[in-house]
Amino acid sequence: MNINDILKKLINKSDLEIDEAEELAKAIIRGEVPEILVSAILVALRMKGESKNEIVGFARAMRELAIKIDVPNAIDTAGTGGDGLGTVNVSTASAILLSLINPVAKHGNRAVSGKSGSADVLEALGYNIIVPPERAKELIHKTNFVFLFAQYYHPAMKNVANVRKTLGIRTIFNILGPLTNPANAKYQLMGVFSKDHLDLLSKSAYELDFNKVILVHGEPGIDEVSPIGKTFMKIVSKRGIEEVKFDVTDFGISSIPIDKLIVNSAEDSAIKIVRAFLGKDEHVAEFIKINTAVALFALDKVSDFKEGYEYAKYLIENSVNKLNEIISLNGDLTKLKTIMVKSSG
């Protein structure tokens, strides 16, 4: 593969084939391409607009080069991040609820543009985010929950970290996280930062051997199920891709004021989650339940979103004990108790 020829092709706004993209991604991730060319390629891809084949090729490369673990029938709630609204980390809270009934391999990283990525909030709750593969299998067996820290499970990505930081713009790597779970999770609720990317990412997911993925983008521009209005969805399964629109009132509840969901830090997010689990923050609790409802539908545990919401109401009642179990087996209960104390007021 001639990198300069690839660059010329991208500058001419020609899309790469899947195999070309996969080979290119492997070379970049392994550190075989000079940084100045990596920068040029990432910018050219962004300016052209990443194609489905390019995303699939890059995702396959990242999956192949990742540290892998086997977690049958797992679900992930990782999204793209980057919506910039700074809401409470609902995907992590939903993952904890889901682990009451199904294996959860939560893939995630530190915050992209929000105040609290999944790694940040789990650390604030006392969780040890560096979990080696053998330990990960043990935790899944004992608790149905493990966090797979992207920086640990994709070690070769350090070869592009400097370029990405220097560029300071979104690149193709920002949208690959949800498609590259090291446990090869077959089920997923995937928040998407832009409505315009739903179609592209759903078509990419269809090529990547998932059983069922629900991609969501909600009003007012949030990479979650909308707390205030419509959620635009793509449901990806072996049968194809279905487009769905769903309103928060279809759950039988009123809209949730977005300002009640904003956080200032990872600790603030952790406190809001614990308060919701304790029944002390109804707004955040509702936000967690509506997102969990859609994840339950992705798992085929319920027949529709309304039934998923009713199931989520039951799960959140058992969430505090589950959180204690998760932290006690892989974390610092003292930190969790500190959050609990701050949440009790």
Curated annotation (Swiss-Prot):
Instruction: Tell me the pathway.
Output: Amino-acid biosynthesis; L-tryptophan biosynthesis; L-tryptophan from chorismate: step 2/5
UniProt-annotated binding residues for 5-phospho-alpha-D-ribose 1-diphosphate: 79, 82-83, 87, 89-92, 106-114, 118
Task: Please tell me whether the keyword Ribosomal protein is annotated for this protein.
Answer: no
Catalytic reactions of this protein: N-(5-phospho-beta-D-ribosyl)anthranilate + diphosphate = 5-phospho-alpha-D-ribose 1-diphosphate + anthranilate
Q: What molecular functions are annotated in GO for this chain? A: anthranilate phosphoribosyltransferase activity; magnesium ion binding
Gene Ontology biological-process entries: L-tryptophan biosynthetic process
Cofactor note (record): Binds 2 magnesium ions per monomer.
GO CC entries: cytosol
**Binding of anthranilate 1, residues:** 79, 109
Reported cofactor(s): Mg(2+)
Q: Where does this protein hold Mg(2+) 1?
A: 91, 224
Q: Describe the family membership recorded for this protein in Swiss-Prot or TrEMBL.
A: Belongs to the anthranilate phosphoribosyltransferase family.
The name on file for this protein is Anthranilate phosphoribosyltransferase
- In its UniProt entry, the species of origin is given as Saccharolobus islandicus (strain L.S.2.15 / Lassen #1) (Sulfolobus islandicus)
Name the lineage: Archaea, Thermoproteota, Thermoprotei, Sulfolobales, Sulfolobaceae
